[in-house]
Regions:
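Intrinsic structural disorder
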Residues: 1, 142-143, 236
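Conserved ATP-binding subdomain of kinase catalytic cores across diverse folds
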Residues: 1-113
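Short C-terminal domain-edge/linker segments immediately following a structured domain
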Residues: 64-68, 119-121, 209-215
């Protein structure tokens, strides 16, 4: 989701930590579904398409511990107006809680953890720090493989919203496990306010940024794969 991020940085090296919070969401307890208003007229479609592709045309759900949140597009009356909404199944059980990477890093490295990242001189070392810090704090196995999968997914769809509150784990009485892959709403360069449909999409590829490190997608994916191996396979 393109939007008003709060970006903290040192020497022009940044980690994005928060999402814009202006999308209205509702939870239907009877149906166990989440509804999110499509403020940009593209997020719902992007989430539904990315969910469908991951579940049916990649090996994502066959990877150890990996699952994919199920999204689809619907309409609903919102404040008296008919609106397009993104609908998703609730993947969090009552006995579980969703814990973001932002929270984990603050608790493990301190509130000034961004300085730890900015002391690293290469993106490869920052990725290693992210994996090691989250792995040590949660004792979750295969943290490197999980985060590499997320980076590969974002590169596949050009998803530009994988900030540290869109990287999350689920914690229950047994410990931590990967959160289903979710929130790919800022994918496919569909935000026409930023990417005019009158211009060839390839012209925008160099401008697209991979979060949370605000780099090009290949600059994040290749070091992650070198450290933890290639994860995602596309079968189209």
């Amino acid at each position: 989701m393109a939007g008003n991020y709060l970006t903290l940085h040192t020497n022009d090296r940044a980690v994005v930590t928060t999402s814009r919070g202006n999308q209205e969401k509702w939870f239907d307890t009877e149906k166990n579904l989440w509804y999110k208003a499509d403020g940009g007229c593209f997020e719902a479609l992007a989430e539904a398409v990315s969910s469908e592709v991951l579940r049916n045309f990649t090996n994502a759900v066959q990877l150890p511990g990996i699952s994919v949140a199920n999204y689809w597009v619907d309409t609903a009356e919102v404040h008296g107006l008919k609106r397009v909404v993104s609908v998703s199944e609730n993947f969090k059980r009552e006995d579980g809680s969703l814990v973001t990477a932002n929270t984990i890093l603050k608790n493990s490295l301190g509130t000034d953890y961004l300085e730890e990242f900015n002391r690293r001189t290469s993106l490869k070392e920052r990725i290693r720090l992210l994996v090691d810090a989250m792995g040590e704090a949660t004792r979750m196995q295969n943290m490197g493989a999980y985060l590499t999968t997320l980076f590969e997914v974002d590169a596949l769809f050009l998803n530009q919203d994988r900030h540290l509150n869109n990287i999350a784990l689920i914690r229950d009485k047994f410990g931590y496990k990967p959160c289903p892959i979710f929130d790919c709403g800022d994918s496919f360069l569909l935000d026409f306010a930023l990417y005019s449909p009158e211009i060839e999409s390839r012209a925008y590829l160099t401008k697209a940024q991979c979060l949370p490190f605000k780099s090009r997608f290949t600059q994040t994916v290749h070091p992650a794969q070198a450290l933890y191996g290639k994860q995602l396979v596309v079968n189209i």
